[in-house]
């Protein structure tokens, strides 16, 4: 959806397959996290878990210049998010945690719900990007609060699922 809006998109993954369809549509493939951070003002991560986020964020922050923005779209540990935010601030890089809800269908259609934690002024500057990926995008507070809201949302969804299962027994 970012490509469809006419914006230039740089991509990186340790494997080529996940980014191939984007490259075929016009995205530019980068050979490393370092080259991605050199080409991009806004770096967005969507990774499987906290360990991957910690590794990739650390590597990205090593090569990011001041004034750039790092965004984590993963569902993650609020304490890890605050740790990354502290490191980013030391490097004069802005950081937002922005976990998403809506699955692959929402991602493909640009209709994700995004719960964003971090500085409001940074959130506001990314309005055109949020418009590409989500229809319900909310700034919910400081660093880590995006993930707190997402985890509460998950807990409520799972509680409802368990209640429904119990009712059917």
Question: Predicted regions: what is each one?
Answer:
Residues 29, 33-94:
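Rossmann-fold NAD(P) dinucleotide-binding segment
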Residues 162:
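Glycine/proline-rich active-site loop of Rossmann-fold NAD(P)-dependent oxidoreductases
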Residues 14-15, 49, 119:
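Residues in the short beta-alpha loop(s) of Rossmann-like NAD(P)-binding domains
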Residues 1-45, 68, 104:
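NAD(P)+-binding Rossmann beta1-loop-alpha1 motif at the extreme N-terminus of oxidoreductases
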Residues 25-27, 44-46, 111-114, 154:
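Short low-complexity, flexible loop/linker segments enriched in glycine and/or proline
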Residues 75-154, 158:
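Rossmann-fold dinucleotide-binding core
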Residues 3, 165-169:
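Amphipathic alpha-helical segments within well-ordered protein domains
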């Amino acid at each position: 959806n970012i490509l469809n809006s006419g914006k230039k998109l740089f991509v990186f993954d340790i494997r080529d397959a996940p980014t191939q369809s984007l490259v075929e549509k016009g995205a530019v493939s980068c050979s490393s996290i370092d080259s991605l951070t050199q080409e991009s003002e806004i770096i967005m991560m969507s990774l499987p878990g906290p360990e991957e986020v910690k590794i990739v964020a650390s590597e990205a922050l090593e090569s990011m210049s001041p004034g750039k923005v790092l965004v984590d779209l993963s569902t993650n540990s609020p304490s890890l998010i605050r740790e990354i935010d502290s490191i980013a601030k030391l490097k004069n890089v802005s950081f937002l945690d922005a976990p998403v809800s809506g699955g692959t269908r929402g991602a493909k259609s640009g209709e994700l719900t995004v719960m964003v934690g971090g500085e409001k002024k940074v959130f506001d500057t990314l309005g055109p990007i949020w418009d590409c990926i989500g229809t319900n995008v909310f700034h919910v507070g400081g660093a880590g609060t995006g993930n707190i809201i997402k985890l509460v949302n998950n807990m409520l969804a799972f509680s409802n699922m368990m209640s429904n299962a119990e009712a059917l027994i």
